[in-house]
A protein has these predicted regions:
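Extended beta-strand/loop cores of jelly-roll/beta-sandwich
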Residues: 1-116, 200-215
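Glutamate identity and glutamate-enriched acidic tracts
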Residues: 12, 29-30, 124, 165, ...
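Functional-site microenvironments in short loops/helix caps that host divalent-cation chemistry
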Residues: 79-188
């Protein structure tokens, strides 16, 4: 592979302060908001939530008592049809709907909360921590890759992945990888890896960002 084609060119960019999701979300999921495990109070897109409220509450009631101290532990995720709840904290589930949609639909949904997809520049900065090395761990592959890549911003970036993360531009920034990719395919672990073509939303993921503006 010609590295000049497989990697984005080196450049200098002014990076604004940002809020960014620690974990990436599957691209075929629309995040509606989050619900408290103790009070059942939902915060987020109430118009979209109203249609699935009964199913969400049924999922939580099936899980157990309202008393958090009575729980042996909340499941990491709960699913019913196209509804998915993910444990977001000790007291909240993130509420999502599994969708068959286009990237433009996802971008529109994110804008409801003031979020968007990162640009290519922002993605590379967030994934690399501002470092210029080829990989997050340096310029050479270790004999055994960790389960997650190191990240100075505390982002959760798994080595094993079904696809890459979406960015604002129509460029693929990674690809499907096993837990221990070969030296040839491991180039897709680089924050600066790129390939042409639209991403497959059924296997891709996305990380919400919001630019912080200081007046």
């Amino acid at each position: 592979t010609d590295l000049t084609q497989a990697l984005s060119p080196q450049r200098e960019v002014a990076m604004p302060p940002m809020l960014v999701a620690t974990k990436a979300t599957p691209a075929n999921e629309e995040i509606l908001g989050r619900i408290s495990l103790t009070t059942r109070i939902f915060k987020g897109n109430h118009m979209r939530y109203a249609a699935i409220r009964a199913q969400v509450l049924h999922l939580l009631d099936r899980q157990g008592s309202l008393d958090p101290f009575a729980q042996s532990g909340w499941a990491a995720s709960l699913t019913s049809g196209n509804i998915k709840l993910r444990l977001a904290s000790a007291h909240h589930y993130q509420v999502s709907i599994v969708k068959s949609w286009q990237k433009a639909d996802l971008i529109k949904s994110l804008s409801f909360f003031g979020f968007r997809l990162p640009t290519q520049d922002q993605y590379e900065y967030l994934q690399s921590g501002g470092r210029q090395s080829l990989f997050a761990f340096g310029n050479t592959l270790p004999p055994q890759l960790p389960r997650y890549l190191p990240n100075p911003f505390g982002l959760t970036i798994p080595v094993e992945r079904a696809g890459g993360e979406l960015i604002a531009e129509d460029i693929q920034k990674s690809t499907a990888l096993p837990a221990q990719p070969s030296a040839k395919t491991a180039l897709a672990l680089s924050p600066f890896y790129q390939s042409e073509g639209a991403a497959d939303l059924t296997v891709a993921s996305y990380r919400r960002v919001a630019t912080v503006t200081v007046n």
